[in-house]
């Protein structure tokens, strides 16, 4: 079987990322479906890293449906935590006693980072593993800590850097709307895949689509 032309392969991958990004953004419009949309985004990205195929629409909506309940709960918890963290930081920086401001701000940021790295793993874990939610959270936390160097650290830096660039650059915002979220998930999936490969893929199986 002849190899696919590298240029054609690249263009196909870009088309898949643009399509995936569009579907992801549309599914995020209701806000409450952000969690299921992120899980489905990783389901497609992880499959693409492993198999190199497309199947964007089929894989996305299958994962969106199968993992909706857990992802919805996780998404709501994540949104609630972000709101509480913002309120907490605002209080200690603007309302709280001056002598406690710096200390509590540092504590809040550290706690926020710990929760953040667990959530980084949680959506891919839901996309790949079938377990009760408490087990999913436990597994995500264990992976985040056990693989902090280098995978968790690299992924968190990539995501935070992308967030900072989006905050400071209009060009980055445009790229995110075009294909950025899908590209970000795809890049991060290379790191996640290395861990999942050790846990799940002891032998290649084309039936493993989750």
Please name every model-derived segment.
Residues 13, 56, 68, 97-102, ...:
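Membrane-helix interface segments
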Residues 201-210:
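Single conserved hydrophobic/aromatic residue that forms the stacking wall/gate
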Residues 71-114:
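Helix-adjacent hinge/juxtasegments
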Residues 1-6:
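Short, Lys/Arg-rich, polar N-terminal cytosolic tail immediately upstream
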Residues 12-22, 63-80, 125-163:
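Interfacial aromatic "cap" segments that immediately flank transmembrane helices
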């Amino acid at each position: 079987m002849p190899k696919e032309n590298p240029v054609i392969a690249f263009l196909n991958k870009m088309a898949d990322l643009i399509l995936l990004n569009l579907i992801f953004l549309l599914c995020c419009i209701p806000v409450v479906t952000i969690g299921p949309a992120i899980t489905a985004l990783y389901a497609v990205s992880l499959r693409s890293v492993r198999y190199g195929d497309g199947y964007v629409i089929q894989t996305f909506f299958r994962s969106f449906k199968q993992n909706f309940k857990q992802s919805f709960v996780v998404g709501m918890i994540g949104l609630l935590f972000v709101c509480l963290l913002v309120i907490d930081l605002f209080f200690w920086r603007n309302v709280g006693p001056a002598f406690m401001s710096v200390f509590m701000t540092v504590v809040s940021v550290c706690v926020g980072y710990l929760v953040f790295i667990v959530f980084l793993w949680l959506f891919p874990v839901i996309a790949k593993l079938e377990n009760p939610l408490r087990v999913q959270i436990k597994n995500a936390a264990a992976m985040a800590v056990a693989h902090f160097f280098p995978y968790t650290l690299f992924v968190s830096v990539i995501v935070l850097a992308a967030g900072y660039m989006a905050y400071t650059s209009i060009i980055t915002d445009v790229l995110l709307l075009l294909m950025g979220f899908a590209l970000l998930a795809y890049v991060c999936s290379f790191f996640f895949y290395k861990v999942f490969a050790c846990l799940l893929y002891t032998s290649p199986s084309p039936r493993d689509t989750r």
